[in-house]
Amino acid sequence: MEYKIVIEKPAMKFLKKQQQGNRDRIIKAIQGLPGIGDIKPMAGHVSLYRLRVGDFRVLYTLENELLVVRVVNIGSRGDVYK
């Protein structure tokens, strides 16, 4: 089963601002979702997960019944959780 990846507007905006090397590395990590990488569920959230890509964090939700990974935000380690 292959998941469809949906990148929300705030995450896409962050990606567009990044240098090509960082952007490629983040996109490659996102393509491995939902099961590959340094992934942890976010405390206090039912279906929100965190993927670590170097100094960046990718926050996403899983919609297993629809086979959708929804990337809701991407940011630097200190800023993405705010």
Regions found by a protein language model. Give the residues of each.
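Enriched for short, Lys/Arg-rich terminal
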Residues: 1-6, 13-16, 21-24, 53-56, ...
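A short, surface-exposed loop/turn module that caps and links secondary-structure elements
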Residues: 28-51
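Short histidine/acidic/glycine/proline-rich micro-motifs that form metal-
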Residues: 12-13, 48
